[in-house]
Amino acid sequence: MREELRNAFPSIDEKTLSDEYIKEHPDLTWDIPDVTLIQAVPLYMLWCIENATEEGELVFDYTISALNKYARAKEPRIEWQDFKFSCNQEQIITVRQFLQWCKTELTQDYEPSLSRAIKNWQTVNTLRSSDAASSVGS
């Protein structure tokens, strides 16, 4: 999962947010970082992958909840909610893979947020696919 995340979001190699920052600011929907969400969110996902043994940390719960919230966002011009609108198709698929990774690899119960996030990101992927298909036919 780590490599898929790095391939889809190359900016994570720049490490614009430290692991310490992420641990001290676990809720990126409340304590919005000074970097764009397209940079911040993948770093939070990477933190979860690299720190899977620290599952008691709030970063896991808040990252899953944030992804659920971002999938439901309706307005691309709202900077603190624009994550899904900034994602390309590969990144959307990678977010879905991350959520599936959470479902299979994490032992704590993140329901109902996790199931909702998976369902909502599946819809994002479907909407993007149908948008692309309709614009090709135009």
Name every feature range the model reports, one short phrase each.
Residues 1-90, 132, 137:
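Alpha-helical solenoid scaffolds in large eukaryotic transport, assembly, and signaling factors
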Residues 72-137:
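Helix-rich interaction surfaces within compact, conserved domain-sized segments
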